[in-house]
Amino acid sequence: MLQWIKKLSLTPIYLAFILIWAYFAVYAGSLLAYLGLGVLLLRLFLTYPFKKSLAALAFLSLFVLFFLLRREMAEQAIRQEPPSASSVQVLPDTIKVNGDSLSFRGRTDGRLYQVFYKIKSASEKEAFQQLTDLVVLAIEGEFEQAQQQRNFSGFDYQAYLKSQGIYRTLKINKIQSLRPISSLNPLDWLSVWRRKALVYIRNNFPSPMSHYMTGLLFGDLDTEFAEMSDLYSSLGIIHLFALSGMQVGFFLDGFRRILLRLGMKRETVNALQLPFSFIYAGLTGFSVSVVRSLVQKLLAQQGLTRLDNFALTLMVLFIIMPNFLLTAGGVLSCAYAFLISMMDFEKLPPIRKLLAESLTISLGILPILIYYFSEF
């Protein structure tokens, strides 16, 4: 991809900026997005030679066609009524038990659903809390539409599920049987490994240590954490539970350092980092912030830095996680990465550098926080 961009004689960040406007024009369909995209394309043809502009437009059109295809597939999935549910495969690392309420993500007929069930007994609750295997439930249930936004600035649960590739919820009325299964899908393996680790930590470590471990290592915050979130916020440590590029860099650098000290060639280590990154992303639930950090780290090892690195990261994410900018978490993660890529305070004294970086990030992210949460 980078070689194609170099042939266009355009900076990658400029193409990425146009792609962001095209992305929101396709997915949001707002007048502002169309207007911004039109202005940028007009400037493209006015600034660069016609042939280069045409080549850039062809390159951008490939992404736009991909966006349109994904949007149409999503719209078809929303319109199409699913058949009646008789069984559902449980993704074990998504299991959440809150009182007598059970929720998880499940797969049936090749589609992903958010599943809800009212637990009937204490033994059933304990069984699901300790469940770590891949299972299929024989059920009686019905599909429903997720709740939309009910008030101004309220949470739009339906839009959130749509951004996760989920277009219906499944309400289970009765579980008839539970059957363990095996799978050849690596994503299922990662789900099982992650679930086993989460259950082990919660069974063997006290609170709040277990919260730290599941949050920092696996990106999972359970219902017990929600009850303590106000306390953590008042102590000023709530941010410690969010996986960030710092943790990703720590694990990747550690993995790389160990292999190099074992005498492996640098080329071999670079190749092994790809499957390691995939496994690590799976163990953290493929969160946008982790995947974005991993992609940036891998590109940095290929010599791409700062804005070129950020631009190529966006383009890769557009392909592997097309919905990443449809959530507040995705927007915030990329905004932080952009601000860090833009900052250059190396010539300042240490204290002034720290203050300048903190102020730049805080002010830069403020409009996004106000837009999504009406607070900061």
Segments (PLM) and residue ranges:
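A residue-level signal for conserved active-site and pocket-lining positions in enzyme catalytic cores
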Residues: W21-A22, L216, G329
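Hydrophobic alpha-helical transmembrane segments in multi-pass membrane proteins
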Residues: G29-Y34, V39, F45-A58, L170, ...
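Membrane-interface helix/helix-cap signal primarily in integral membrane proteins
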Residues: L2-W4, F63-H239
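Short linear sequence motifs
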Residues: A16, Y27, F59-L60, V97, ...
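N-terminal leader/targeting segments
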Residues: M1-R79, T169, R292, L317
